């Protein structure tokens, strides 16, 4: 799967989703080719932005604290994806639509891509712009979760897929807020 197909996956149930159904990637492949490299992006941007103009975001935090927060953020991000996959897997069983863990991991690996890419906005030292892009990325992540749940888990009802995507995104939002708190408090 190419990241170039990501925009169409936000708005369509086909495109990249059909490719993932036709040629399902292994968990190791998704982790190595999507999760690991893209998880490095927010940590690197926190390291850069915090070291250069961290006072714009949180006054009084030293560059060394930003650098430590970036490392903690990376570890937390890498741990969050398998936890989210487990949550999707558990949710699929609760609504009586059991899914393979591999499909759940694929959704958990693809859904945060907009959030990871949104870290590039940290090149702009403006908290309002960063927040606006973060909200847009969150909306795209919700759309990817919904379309991924509906398509990869072969859901038959829109409402159940939306319900599951909302629960998973809510948990993901909570995890994201915890990660942001790690960055801001550390």
Regions found by a protein language model. Give the residues of each.
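Alpha-helical transmembrane segments of multi-pass integral membrane proteins
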Residues: 36-45, 111, 169-176
């Amino acid at each position: 799967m190419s990241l170039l197909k990501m925009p169409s996956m936000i708005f369509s149930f086909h495109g990249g989703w059909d490719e993932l159904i036709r040629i399902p990637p292994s968990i190791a492949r998704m982790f190595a080719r999507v999760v690991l490299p893209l998880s490095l992006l927010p940590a690197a941007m926190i390291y850069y932005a915090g070291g250069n103009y961290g006072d714009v975001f949180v006054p009084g935090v030293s560059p060394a604290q930003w650098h430590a927060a970036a490392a903690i953020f990376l570890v937390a991000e890498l741990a969050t994806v398998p936890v989210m996959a487990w949550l999707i897997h558990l949710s699929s069983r609760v609504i009586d639509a059991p899914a393979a863990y591999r499909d759940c991991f694929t959704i958990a690996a693809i859904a945060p891509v907009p959030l990871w890419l949104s870290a590039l906005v940290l090149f702009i030292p403006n908290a309002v712009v960063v927040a606006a892009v973060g909200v847009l990325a969150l909306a795209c992540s919700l759309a990817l979760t919904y379309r991924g749940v509906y398509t990869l888990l072969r859901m038959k009802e829109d409402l159940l897929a939306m319900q599951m995507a909302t629960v998973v995104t809510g948990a993901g939002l909570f995890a994201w807020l915890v990660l942001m708190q790690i960055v801001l408090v550390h």
